[in-house]
Regions:
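Active-site phosphate-binding/coordination module
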Residues: 21-121
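Asp-based phosphoryl-transfer active-site loop
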Residues: 2-19, 223
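Glycine-rich beta-strand-to-loop/alpha-helix junction loops that act as flexible
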Residues: 10, 68-69, 213-215
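A short acidic, helix-capping loop that chelates divalent metal ions and anchors anionic groups
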Residues: 14-16, 51, 73-76, 182-184
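Short, small/polar residue-rich loop motifs at catalytic or cofactor-binding pockets
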Residues: 1-2, 66, 206
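Conserved acidic, metal-coordinating active-site core of Asp-based
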Residues: 100-222
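Hydrophobic "anchor" residues on beta-strands that sit immediately upstream
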Residues: 5, 63, 211
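Conserved Rossmann-like nucleotide-cofactor binding loop
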Residues: 13, 48, 218
Length: 223
């Protein structure tokens, strides 16, 4: 079968953790795939507004599977799939992270915002040698314009179980980055695979004609 679509995670896959952007050799390899006639989608936990040109280093995806499948666009920016957290989910997260002194951010249309303990994220970005991409949102008013696609945070992994015990009825899932304290926080229905299905539908192809690459727990659906 001829493959028509290649879906690639960014952080840890296209961009090695120790580098501030996608390396030139990876950009060249992806462009070669596109030149061969295969469409390329980035499939990431980041929202579209949290992916800078500098990060991609010249890479131009044909499709964007962002916010772990909740924000899906074509190259022109047309929305193919859009799913949001509700107010109850969002406020429960804010209360919990404030109570435990941990960092919490949300992914919005215009980028990611740090709502709780933003300074923790800034320190982490400096330590990881990546450009700052999270807005200071500690005024906690960005959601009055539109609700977020997803959340992300930094907390001891044991605290995620405490959150589930208290707010399990909300269906939120904590997907940690390996053994670290960083995580994506997704709704029960949210998955990169839903974004992949939306892209395949837009292309008029069967998902079996797609190939995916990723390295994290939020990539399991597309793999």
């Amino acid at each position: 079968m001829q493959y028509q679509l290649l879906a690639l995670d960014i952080d840890g896959t296209l961009r090695p953790d120790a580098q501030p952007c996608v390396p030139r050799e990876n950009v060249a390899a992806v462009k070669a795939v596109q030149k061969a006639g295969v469409k390329v989608a980035v499939a990431t936990g980041r929202c579209r507004g949290g992916i800078s040109k500098a990060l991609l280093n010249g890479l131009r995806p044909d499709y964007w599977i962002c916010a772990a499948g909740a924000e899906v666009q074509d190259a022109a920016g047309n929305m193919l799939h859009d799913a949001r957290m509700d107010a109850q989910q969002m406020y429960a997260l804010v209360d919990f992270f404030e109570d435990h002194g941990c960092f919490l951010g949300f992914n919005f249309d215009d980028g990611p915002y740090g709502y709780v303990n933003y300074y923790i994220q800034r320190e982490a970005e400096l330590a990881m040698n990546v450009n700052s991409y999270v807005h200071d949102g500690e005024d906690q008013d960005r959601h009055l314009e539109s609700m977020p696609f997803s959340a992300f945070g930094r907390l001891p992994q044991a605290l995620a179980e405490q959150f589930r015990q208290k707010y399990g009825h909300l269906g939120l899932r904590f997907l940690f980055y390996g053994s670290s304290e960083g995580c994506d926080i997704l709704t029960a229905e949210q998955d990169k695979s839903r974004g992949l299905e939306a892209v395949c539908a837009a292309m008029g192809i069967d998902p079996a004609q797609a190939v995916a690459m990723g390295d994290g727990s939020n990539d399991c659906g597309i793999l």
